A protein has these predicted regions:
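Periplasmic-binding protein-like
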Residues: 35-36, 85-91, 148-151, 187, ...
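Alpha-helical recognition/docking segments in bacterial nutrient-uptake
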Residues: 31-137, 141, 205-206
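Alpha-helical structural signal in soluble globular domains
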Residues: 16, 57-61, 166-178, 224-232
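N-terminal helix-turn-helix DNA-binding module of bacterial transcription factors
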Residues: 2-30
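Hinge/beta->alpha junction and helix N-cap segments in small-molecule ligand-binding domains
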Residues: 41-49, 73-77, 124-134, 150-200, ...
Length: 302
């Protein structure tokens, strides 16, 4: 027996549902045998809470999307990863040898935070290039001309040796565009630790003339930089303004509270899982590289 509902009544029901925020429940088809490759070195995890946040969020969202995950980390090695995977999600840094071995096991995969071979696999990344460009643009609009950069290195997947990180590259391009690129104000370490930020902050203080603004590649580095500047009795932002990336929880409690670009980890993870579902359910030969933008959170450091 069918129930007849007038168009006006139906419209009223839909309007009320929309008003109270009702959302239709989505039934996701089950996807089994998906590997979560958490190939993050212990030192890297301590340096950048981004990785750990992504791992936790992927596990939470995968459960909601009916995706069955098995987790493997770097100490397990590629030999422990099954050869009959439906798909995989990779977080962290893999060598060329590991990437090739992974491709032989499974051709359906999504990398988060890196795109080691965009010809082979999908990837979702924070739009670091845009973040740094926004930072430089902001400082220039505020009248700064002596703009510095504090960051870390990337790694070459073929050699394992340090290579230029996209944030440094973007800073150099943006600063050069305005005619403000000064090598004396660029400080690079191999890693992104608080200690490295502190050390580079101390090196900065040795300069006879300080930059009036600093772009810092991550909040973790910025914690150390702020400590060094505070110990040097540098007034922030009056003498040196500081702008960073990540918006970790501690950022709002630093002295002064840190201006930073918020990275939307839930959005990144949802995008990655959507790519994975589409790849498993519908196939397709063209790989996708997705950049997720961030939102500046202005506090008292600039």
């Amino acid at each position: 027996r069918q129930m007849c509902i007038r168009d006006r009544t139906r419209e009223a029901i839909f309007a009320t549902a929309e008003k109270i925020g009702y959302k239709k429940r989505v039934i996701y088809p089950k996807i089994e045998n998906v590997a979560l490759l958490y190939f993050v070195d212990h030192e890297d995890e301590l340096e950048d809470v981004f990785y750990h946040g992504v791992k936790d969020e992927i596990i939470k969202q995968a459960k909601k999307m009916n995706i069955q995950l098995s987790i493997y980390d770097r100490k397990d090695g590629m030999d422990h990863v099954p050869k009959d995977l439906s798909a995989f999600i990779a977080i962290g840094w893999l060598t060329r040898k590991e990437i090739n071995a992974l491709y032989k096991r499974c051709k359906r995969g999504v990398f988060i935070g890196t795109s080691p071979d965009e010809k082979l696999f999908d990837a979702v990344k924070p739009n670091m290039d845009s973040f740094v460009t926004q930072m430089v643009d902001y400082f220039v609009e505020k009248g700064h001309k002596r703009i510095g950069f504090i960051g870390g290195s990337d790694r070459n997947i073929d050699t394992g040796k340090p290579s230029m990180d996209i944030r440094e590259w973007s800073f150099r391009q943006s600063a050069a565009y305005y005619g403000y690129l000064n090598e004396e104000y660029i400080f690079i370490s191999e890693r992104f630790t608080v200690d490295d930020g502190y050390r580079m902050g101390k090196e900065l203080l040795k300069k006879e003339i300080l930059p009036t603004a600093l772009c810092v590649a991550s909040d973790t580095l910025a914690v150390g930089v702020l400590q060094a500047l505070n110990e040097g009795n540098i007034q922030i932002p009056e003498q040196v303004a500081v702008f960073s990336i990540n918006d970790v929880n501690i950022a709002k409690y630093l002295s002064p509270p840190l201006t930073t670009i918020h990275i939307d980890i839930p959005c990144i993870c949802e995008t990655a899982l959507d790519l994975l579902r589409n790849r498993v359910l519908y196939g397709g030969r063209v790989t996708k590289l997705v950049f997720v933008n961030g939102i500046p959170v202005f506090r008292k450091s600039c």
